[in-house]
A protein has these predicted regions:
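Long beta-sheet-rich domains in secretory-pathway and surface-associated proteins
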Residues: 1-287
């Protein structure tokens, strides 16, 4: 309550008007404003009565005003989002879940319809539980902490490619005012997992002095996404170990080949051996 009148004392909530001639009148204007967003609707708790006392030395009178708080409908849905799932390199399905809160942000009790669109997840054979259409009834207003909580769960199949993403949506609508609606998205994304395996066409070979011997190394990308594999050799430098290439970019489930070559030193004797020589392969996950 406030007033622009010069007689108004804001601290005392009082106006001292002074002398008014008999038969005259004095217009005193006050402004009544609603502060904050938690005031309950008059249709829910009734109107607020504001009383003013008017007095001089001998007569006391009261003036009453009735303040009406209009209905206000609003909704807030919380708990949605995307979750990363790391089961692309396993045979284990993985379950993700969300704790969902539907809050009445209005100023009177309200019902809310909750509907789900699960077409995307269902088409990908990702099963969902807890996503049943429903009506939440008589949810208390914001000032009384009206909230309805539930859980939704989705199963992500194993062995999927990196970046695979599916999900569903939820729409919450106020019954009191259908223009008050909110849609939330729920999804899961399969993250990139890495793995490689190696085979070689032979582990021993022979060659004349000054000649070379080739070993074909096959690398399989066992991860669920494209991987750039780097190679490194180890072996006696006199036998000049070398590789046909230093890296290969390999799609998931595919193979890449690199040729490892050892050259017999020209001055080698018939019994000369290279000793242990190795090829190391490093997935890009190794940094």
């Amino acid at each position: 309550i406030d007033s622009d009148d010069s007689s108004w004392d804001e601290m005392e909530m009082e106006a001292t008007i002074g002398y008014i001639d008999a038969g005259d009148s004095y217009d005193f204007e006050v402004q009544v404003s609603l502060s904050g967003s938690y005031a309950l609707a008059s249709s829910y708790v009734g109107n607020s009565v504001l009383a003013f006392q008017v007095s001089d030395d001998n007569i006391i009178d009261f003036v009453e005003f009735e303040a009406v708080v209009e209905d206000n409908f609003a909704v807030s849905a919380q708990g949605s989002g995307n979750q990363d799932v790391d089961n692309g390199c396993t045979d284990q399905d993985y379950k993700v879940d969300w704790d969902v809160n539907i809050k009445n942000f209005g100023n009177l009790p309200d019902d809310f319809t909750v509907s789900f669109d699960t077409a995307d997840a269902v088409a990908a054979a990702w099963s969902i539980t807890g996503a049943d259409d429903m009506t939440v009834e008589n949810l208390l207003p914001k000032a009384e902490d009206g909230v309805y909580s539930f859980n939704v769960e989705m199963t992500v199949p194993s062995g999927l490619a990196a970046g695979t993403k599916h999900g569903f949506s939820m729409t919450v609508t106020s019954v009191g005012d259908s223009s008050q609606t909110q849609t939330q998205e729920f999804s899961a994304t399969v993250v990139h997992c890495y793995g490689i395996s190696m085979t070689v066409d032979k582990t021993k070979d022979s060659a004349d002095p000054g000649a070379s011997s080739d070993f074909t190394v096959t690398v399989t990308n066992d991860g669920n996404g494209e991987d750039t594999v780097s190679y490194m050799t180890m072996g006696a430098q006199a036998w000049t170990p070398s590789l046909s290439e230093m890296s290969s970019t390999i799609a998931s489930g595919e193979t890449g080949q690199v040729v490892f070559t050892l050259t017999v030193p020209a001055d080698s004797s018939a019994a000369a051996k290279s000793g242990m020589a190795m090829v190391h392969a490093y997935s890009e996950a190794c940094g």
